[in-house]
């Protein structure tokens, strides 16, 4: 059981290489929301 589990874990990163560009962008999403809130507040005059 253990060797099978380790083998599966070793193969998962290779299987997800297709999604590497998306994963690189994911940490920026909260920053985009922060920027959106700032622009929105600037548009309404920081009420």
Swiss-Prot record:
Subunit structure, interactors included: PSII is composed of 1 copy each of membrane proteins PsbA, PsbB, PsbC, PsbD, PsbE, PsbF, PsbH, PsbI, PsbJ, PsbK, PsbL, PsbM, PsbT, PsbX, PsbY, Psb30/Ycf12, peripheral proteins PsbO, CyanoQ (PsbQ), PsbU, PsbV and a large number of cofactors. It forms dimeric complexes.
Sorted UniProt keywords: Membrane, Photosynthesis, Photosystem II, Reaction center, Thylakoid, Transmembrane, Transmembrane helix
HAMAP family xrefs: PSII_PsbK
Name of this protein: Photosystem II reaction center protein K
GO cellular component terms, A-Z: photosystem II reaction center; plasma membrane-derived thylakoid membrane
InterPro entries: PSII_PsbK, PSII_PsbK_sf
Any one GO BP annotation for this protein: photosynthesis
NCBIfam families named among the record's database cross-references: PRK02553.1 (NF002715)
Transmembrane segments: 26-46
Protein family according to the UniProt entry: Belongs to the PsbK family.
Bilayer topology term: Single-pass membrane protein
Pfam families documented for this protein: PsbK
Propeptide residues per the UniProt entry: 1-10
Subcellular location: Cellular thylakoid membrane
Physiological role: One of the components of the core complex of photosystem II (PSII). PSII is a light-driven water:plastoquinone oxidoreductase that uses light energy to abstract electrons from H(2)O, generating O(2) and a proton gradient subsequently used for ATP formation. It consists of a core antenna complex that captures photons, and an electron transfer chain that converts photonic excitation into a charge separation.
